Amino acid sequence: MSFTVDDRVLALAGIAQALQQVRRIADTGHSDAAAVRTAVDSVFRVDASSPQEVFGDRHALKSGLRLLHNYFRSQGQDPILPKLALSVLQLERRFVQDGATVNKVASGIERAQRQANELGDSGHPDVLANLGGLYADTISHLKPRVMVQGNPHYLGQAGVVAEIRALLLAAVRAAVLWRQLGGSYWDFLFGRKAMIEAVDRQLA
């Protein structure tokens, strides 16, 4: 199956949108519930091979697509977000090369999905705590570590930390998808124009 630049920008939008919520909750203690569910649901769709299967309707990634739109036009308002995204893309490389960690994450996701099904809510605090703990026990030990800055008052709260880690897990999942779709760092150097056009098509 061949994939297009349109598919790849949707995966990048998934990364950007998850990290936008990381930044938001780290600064304010609050997140967008719909965006969090989109991110968490993508983690559970481990066997999906296209961004449509992973994220559902492209409108679910609208805020992520807008972030990409602004970034490619040097209109981004959060200079930390691209740095976080780069860290996630680098972390994904280490993650997929560590078979033991991949297996642990896969098993943990299965358990969390059963929990979400029982609770009937993928955004339930217990599910986020489960996924956050999974990230802390596995991917967070790989280098480079994704360093999240924010308000110390909120970063000292267990629920906030768990949600941030769950969202980081979702960002890594989107990065894995991006690679599977043929994404590479060269896209940002030589495929920028095509990516801008693809983002505009998805937002149209």
From Swiss-Prot:
Its main location: cytoplasm. Signal peptide: none annotated. One of its GO terms (cellular component) is cytoplasm. It holds the Pfam family DUF489. It comes from the Bacteria. InterPro entries: HflD, HflD-like_sf. Disulfide bonds: none annotated. Keywords: Cell inner membrane, Cell membrane, Cytoplasm, Membrane. It is a peripheral membrane protein. It is found in: Cytoplasm; Cell inner membrane. Belongs to the HflD family. This is High frequency lysogenization protein HflD homolog. It comes from Stenotrophomonas maltophilia (strain K279a).
